[in-house]
């Protein structure tokens, strides 16, 4: 049965959308008016490399069995949807029209699957060790999440690396690392049934007889998506330096021993919260994947471009580590550098200052 899925965020969201469309489900992308008009006219293109193929293939939404449309936040009719995907960067949810839509989503009690790096606050409330911690400081505006029931919000580890090529239109996405979305289960079994249905449908898709990478994998453990934290703190946030941004590869491989110590420390924090070592990704596997990540992280690129706010998983992990009594000088240093770079932009003239 075709499901109808609403995804907030048309850039990274178009990757999950394409996988759902290939499996015969219908998707609405929520974005700016100009981008919505472009997508409604031309569809989306996601470039992905299949196993054993040398070049990326363009997968066009208009050629897929599911139907795609795009709309602005104000025009969403929530009664049409079975599931909401959260694919915007965390600071974007503070936009007024998005906030209004988020209030409606919370009131409609629709299950929400996040593919953000920054875990939604209600998701963290599902983890007993975090439920009473003071973590609001890490969010641009924590009030956005106040109305959501924790059991209705789950998180995917957004491992696939993808970016919008700067020379292309806003409906094109290039997938650099086609790994899987690893989702934790919802609290409600009916919602998990839907999630596992989508997992199976995506898994069954082939293209010219070839398997298509980037699957949706569902896990019972709430801690599987937290494996991403070790990667973000070791690579993505350390792309932000006091000077120019560096690539993820250089951040990780510049001092492999230091990188492993940071990675292991964050893994240790997740285990203190209740994660099983099986929920985690070995450092060696991550370091190998990082060899092919030749660009700075999206966070580093955003800071370099003058963004006044970015997702702050670095600060979130710092707050948790201090409240657990397990701080790390290296993590604290990373947070300090990110704060310093963001403050430079604000002092230089706020949003958009170069």
Residue ranges and their predicted role:
Residues 79, 113-230, 234-235:
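Rossmann-fold dinucleotide-binding core
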Residues 31-81, 102:
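Conserved N-terminal Rossmann-fold NAD(P) cofactor-binding segment
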Residues 21-22, 106, 271:
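Anion (oxyanion) recognition and catalysis
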Residues 1-50, 121-122, 354:
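NAD(P)+-binding Rossmann beta1-loop-alpha1 motif at the extreme N-terminus of oxidoreductases
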Residues 75-120:
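Rossmann-fold NAD(P) dinucleotide-binding segment
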Residues 179-302:
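C-terminal substrate-binding/catalytic lobe of Rossmann-fold NAD(P)-dependent dehydrogenases
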Residues 267-354:
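C-terminal active-site/capping subdomain that shapes the small-molecule cofactor and substrate pocket
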Residues 34, 96, 189, 193, ...:
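Conserved active-site and cofactor/substrate-binding residues in soluble primary-metabolism enzymes
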């Amino acid at each position: 049965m075709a499901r109808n899925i609403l995804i907030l965020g048309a850039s990274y969201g178009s990757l999950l959308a394409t996988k759902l469309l290939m499996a015969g489900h219908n998707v609405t992308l929520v974005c700016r008016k100009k981008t919505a008009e472009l997508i409604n006219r031309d569809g989306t293109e996601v470039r992905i490399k299949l196993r054993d193929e040398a070049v990326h293939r363009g997968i066009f939404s208009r050629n897929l069995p599911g139907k795609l449309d795009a709309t602005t936040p104000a025009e969403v009719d929530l009664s049409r949807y079975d599931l909401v995907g959260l694919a915007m960067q965390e600071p974007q949810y503070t936009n007024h029209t998005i906030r209004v839509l988020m209030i409606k989503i919370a009131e409609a009690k629709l299950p929400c699957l996040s593919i953000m790096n920054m875990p939604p606050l209600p998701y963290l409330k599902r983890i007993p060790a975090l439920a009473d911690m003071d973590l609001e400081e890490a969010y641009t505006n924590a009030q956005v999440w106040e109305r959501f029931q924790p059991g209705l919000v789950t998180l995917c580890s957004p491992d696939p690396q993808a970016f919008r090529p700067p020379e292309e239109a806003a409906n094109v996405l290039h997938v650099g690392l086609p790994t899987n979305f690893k989702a934790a289960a919802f609290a409600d079994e009916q919602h998990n049934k839907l999630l596992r249905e989508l997992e199976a449908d995506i898994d069954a898709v082939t293209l010219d007889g070839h398997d298509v990478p980037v699957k949706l994998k569902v896990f019972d453990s709430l801690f599987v998506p937290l494996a991403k934290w070790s990667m973000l703190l070791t690579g993505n946030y350390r792309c932000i330096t006091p000077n120019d941004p560096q690539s993820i590869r250089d951040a990780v491989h510049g001092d492999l021993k230091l990188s492993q110590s940071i990675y292991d420390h964050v893994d240790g924090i997740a285990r203190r919260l209740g994660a099983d070592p099986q929920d985690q990704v070995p450092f060696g596997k991550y370091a190998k994947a990082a060899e092919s990540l030749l660009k700075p992280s999206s966070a580093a690129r955003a800071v370099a471009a003058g963004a006044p706010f970015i997702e702050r998983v670095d600060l979130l992990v710092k707050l948790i580590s201090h409240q657990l009594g397990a701080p790390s000088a290296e993590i604290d240093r990373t947070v300090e550098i990110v704060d310093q770079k963001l403050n430079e932009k604000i002092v230089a003239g706020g949003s958009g200052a170069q």
